[in-house]
């Protein structure tokens, strides 16, 4: 559960106080990174793009890792993102089914790398939310909402009926064909 590559961080920062602006505006951002150092770097990257605040004349007030409240229940997650491809910037909405938001984000990064050849630095997560099962749009997520869902049994191994018939070494390989 806790072995995710990306962790969710909340970074709080502001520009340094100046004689004209003694109480600068405080900005809070939730973002995904592999560690705290990269989370801070990403925070300054976005803040420089959004507001006129740079790392050289700014300060980090707090950085906290955000953990899932109940990481044992399965939820549907919606992720709104923007990514840079070879042809330009694109907006996208993705849905994933996972026990944690970090797991869903991990799935998203893996899928974007495999389907679109877009690596981690080129992806900007705009928003994430838990989506109610009635509001899910993607068929890939909807297929798991049915109560009569069945999974095919593709690997059948015949077990011996009693312990007496169990042997360590077999004379022939087992036939697993169904």
From Swiss-Prot:
Protein name: Large ribosomal subunit protein eL20
HAMAP family: Ribosomal_eL20
GO MF annotations, alphabetized: structural constituent of ribosome
Gene: RPL18A
Keyword Ribosomal protein: yes
Superkingdom of this protein's organism: Eukaryota
Listed Gene3D superfamilies: 3.10.20.10
Pfam families: Ribosomal_L18A
Keywords of the record: Ribonucleoprotein, Ribosomal protein
Gene Ontology biological process terms in this record: cytoplasmic translation
Family: Belongs to the eukaryotic ribosomal protein eL20 family.
Species annotation: Oryza sativa subsp. japonica
């Amino acid at each position: 559960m806790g072995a995710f590559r990306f962790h969710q961080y909340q970074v709080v920062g502001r520009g340094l106080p100046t004689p004209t602006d003694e109480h600068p505006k405080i900005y809070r951002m939730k973002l995904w990174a592999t560690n705290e150092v990269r989370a801070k770097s990403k925070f300054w990257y976005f803040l420089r793009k959004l507001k006129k605040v740079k790392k050289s004349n700014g300060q980090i007030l707090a950085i906290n890792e955000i953990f899932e409240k109940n990481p044992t229940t399965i939820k549907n997650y919606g992720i709104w993102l923007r990514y840079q491809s070879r042809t330009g910037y694109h907006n996208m909405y993705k849905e994933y089914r996972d026990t944690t938001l970090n797991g869903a984000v991990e799935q998203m990064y893996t899928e974007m790398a495999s389907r679109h050849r877009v690596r981690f630095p080129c992806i900007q997560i705009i928003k994430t939310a838990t989506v109610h099962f009635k509001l899910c749009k993607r068929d890939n997520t909807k297929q798991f909402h049915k109560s009569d869902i069945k999974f095919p049994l593709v690997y059948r191994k015949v077990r011996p009926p009693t312990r007496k018939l169990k042997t360590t070494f077999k004379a022939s390989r087992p036939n697993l064909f169904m």
